[in-house]
A protein has these predicted regions:
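Aromatic sugar-binding surface patches on proteins
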Residues: 175-202
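Beta-strand/loop nucleic-acid-binding surfaces
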Residues: 68-75
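Short nucleic-acid-contacting surface segments enriched for D/E, G, S/T with interspersed K/R
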Residues: 78-86
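Surface-exposed, glycine-biased beta-strand/turn segments
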Residues: 4-64, 86-87, 95-100, 110-169, ...
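Histidine-centered divalent metal-coordination motifs
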Residues: 72, 98-104
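Short beta-strand edge segments in extracellular beta-sheet folds
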Residues: 230-233
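Glycine- and acidic-residue-rich phosphate-binding/metal-coordinating active-site segment common to enzymes
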Residues: 106-108
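Short coil/turn segments at the loop-to-beta-strand junctions that recur within blades
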Residues: 75-76, 121
Length: 233
């Protein structure tokens, strides 16, 4: 997988644009493979060669087997297949004021969170943990987070009695059979978003009695918030 350090050389494709849907979020029954940005104009995130362009889609090939994908974009007149483009070159205009931006690693066959390469969200707030629920029969722990701050969400960890037992990172999405999985095979869409307004972690087994459960939420720049809870089984 391409390291975050090398991806950081890429530019945000819409300076001043607003992220309205984050990577890995639940959308239309599957994970969002990129980010949705509210903006009028779209610019090349890095120099490369136009691999494909159509009525509302542009794909640009870069070094290191990386593609940047721009959906819901009407291409500029100077954009055509195989043409070389420079970093920051205007690619086109959005349709309806919103476009989808994705980064795909051809070698690793997975989508990479575009926010690994931009400081666009440095000032975003971390989400707050509103509560926990536990299904002892299924070993499912649900974490309820506030919507505010989800754009900057990088990792959620579950710690039971001081030991990390599960970790969910918003780094990559890949295809597994007919579905998409987030970060690790354990996190399929139907499991993670099975309860409305919650992230559900499978395979969490709590001991009978009182359990100390911590939820550690981290953003892309290492800021953390910790929620301390107790669950009695």
């Amino acid at each position: 997988m391409m390291a975050a350090a090398s991806l950081s050389a890429y530019d945000f494709p819409a300076p001043g644009g607003k992220i309205i849907s984050s990577f890995g979020s639940g959308s239309k029954g599957e994970f969002n493979t990129g980010i949705d940005i509210q903006a009028d104009n779209v610019f090349a995130s890095e120099a490369g060669e136009v691999l494909y362009y159509g009525p509302d889609f542009i794909a640009v090939a870069h070094e290191d087997s990386i593609l940047t994908l721009y959906s819901h974009v009407t291409a500029s007149e100077d954009i055509s297949k195989d043409v070389h483009i420079s970093r920051g070159q205007r690619l086109g205009r959005t349709k309806g004021g919103v476009f989808h931006f994705a980064v795909y690693d051809l070698e690793m066959e997975r989508y990479i969170n575009p926010l690994l390469m931009t400081d666009n969200i440095k000032k975003s707030e971390l989400p707050k943990v509103k509560g926990l629920s536990y299904d002892s029969a299924g070993g499912m722990l649900s974490v309820y987070l506030s919507d505010k701050g989800l754009q900057g969400l990088y990792m959620v960890q579950i710690s039971v009695d001081g030991q990390v037992v599960s970790s969910l990172g918003f780094r990559t999405v890949r295809r597994k059979g007919d579905t998409l999985v987030l970060d690790r095979e354990a996190f399929e869409y139907g499991t993670l978003y099975g309860r409305e307004g919650a992230f559900t972690f499978p395979g969490i087994h709590l001991n009978p009695g009182d359990n100390s459960v911590d939820v550690i939420v981290t953003d892309f720049y290492g800021k953390k918030v910790v929620f301390h809870g107790r669950i009695t089984v």
